[in-house]
């Protein structure tokens, strides 16, 4: 696995729930690729998850990925909560169904295809990769709104 990909992901939602978008900036050997999309009725957390899922799904072969997100929800889910959710059959400690379990399961499947290193960055402080992902997520929102 010598292919190393830098990936920056972000989600956006206008209203929560409301129209939302996700964005991904990938950099591989100096070449950039942008991905974005959106949904008419969603939440910010779902769009944060979707950005990571779509970015990882777009990779054609097993890669080393450094995935940077500004989402504490994604970071805590992947690094702290998911292992116990899986042990409990996708239930929380309170025995409630995990919110967004459909997307967490997709993310788990994609993470297992690659060697992913997760990084968190504070949002909206001028980090270039994160700012680009944010712009792409907002493009996703704008395109969904334009379809109405």
UniProtKB/Swiss-Prot annotation:
Its main location: cytoplasm. Its cofactor is Mg(2+). Gene3D superfamilies: Ribonuclease H-like superfamily/Ribonuclease H. Belongs to the RNase H family. Endonuclease that specifically degrades the RNA of RNA-DNA hybrids. This is Ribonuclease HI. It comes from Pseudomonas putida (strain ATCC 47054 / DSM 6125 / CFBP 8728 / NCIMB 11950 / KT2440). GO terms for cellular component: cytoplasm. One of its GO terms (biological process) is DNA replication, removal of RNA primer. GO terms for molecular function: magnesium ion binding; nucleic acid binding; RNA-DNA hybrid ribonuclease activity. Mg(2+) 1 binds at residues 10, 48, 70. It is an enzyme of class 3 (hydrolase).
């Amino acid at each position: 696995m010598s292919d190393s990909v830098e990936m920056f992901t972000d989600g956006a939602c206008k209203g929560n729930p409301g129209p939302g978008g996700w964005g991904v900036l990938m950099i591989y050997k100096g070449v950039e690729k942008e991905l974005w999309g959106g949904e008419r009725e969603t939440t910010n957390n779902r769009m944060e998850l979707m950005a990571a899922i779509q970015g990882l799904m777009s990779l054609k072969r097993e890669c080393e990925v450094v995935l940077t997100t500004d989402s504490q929800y994604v970071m805590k889910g992947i690094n702290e909560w998911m292992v116990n959710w899986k042990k409990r059959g996708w239930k929380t400690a309170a025995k409630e169904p995990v919110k967004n379990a459909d997307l967490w399961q997709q993310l788990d499947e994609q993470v297992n295809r690659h060697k992913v290193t997760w990084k968190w960055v504070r949002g909206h402080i001028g980090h270039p990769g994160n700012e680009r992902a944010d712009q792409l997520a907002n493009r996703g929102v704008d395109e969904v709104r334009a379809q109405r």
